[in-house]
Amino acid sequence: MARSTARKRALNTLYEADEKSQDILSLLDERIAHPGAQTPLPDYAIEIVKGVAEHRRQIDMTLDEHSTGWKVRRMGVVDRNILRIAAWEILFTDDVPDKVAIDEALALAKTLCDDDSPAFIHGLLSAVCTAKNAAPAPESVAEEADEESSDSAAAASEPTDEGDVSDSPDSSGASDEPAAPSAEIQPTVD
């Protein structure tokens, strides 16, 4: 229950920053220093707000990429920030299972959004999860590239039977093999 409350408090902060067109981290600093009538923000709410602020551009690009018919900037403010919280948990945290992130987003949407929002949010977050699970993790792409580079270097240093080095890779590092797929999200063009 504590994390559910933290998500709601993080949503309130993100919503307020979005509505006021205020810098998220500046507003967060204000809320931490002067919580007002509310209890201080839970640590997990602070972590969410900082995480969304740090990764907002990538989160929004990912949501835009997987959204059908709606760009993030056109979504309702509450919907948009519920999606940002869940996308941050899905893409950037390891301690929250994807299903939990989706279920928590749906719980917020059912109480705070219109009747169509939960289905839209569920579909969009499911697409984000599917894409995340289909793509190699950034660490594994880097490890594969390191292994390929080590294999190429080892093969280049091995002498051939005839002493011919024409089959070794050239010194420019060019290779006939395709490059490993990029794990970065590419922006979409409207």
UniProtKB/Swiss-Prot annotation:
One of its GO terms (cellular component) is cytosol. Pfam families: NusB. InterPro entries: NusB-like_sf, NusB_fam, NusB_RsmB_TIM44. SUPFAM superfamilies: NusB-like. GO terms for biological process: DNA-templated transcription termination; transcription antitermination. GO terms for molecular function: RNA binding. Signal peptide: none annotated. Keywords: RNA-binding, Transcription, Transcription antitermination, Transcription regulation. It comes from the Bacteria. Residues 135-190 are annotated as: Disordered. Residues 141-150 have a biased composition (Acidic residues). PANTHER family: ANTITERMINATION NUSB DOMAIN-CONTAINING PROTEIN (PTHR11078:SF3), N UTILIZATION SUBSTANCE PROTEIN B-RELATED (PTHR11078). Belongs to the NusB family. Involved in transcription antitermination. Required for transcription of ribosomal RNA (rRNA) genes. Binds specifically to the boxA antiterminator sequence of the ribosomal RNA (rrn) operons. This is Transcription antitermination protein NusB.
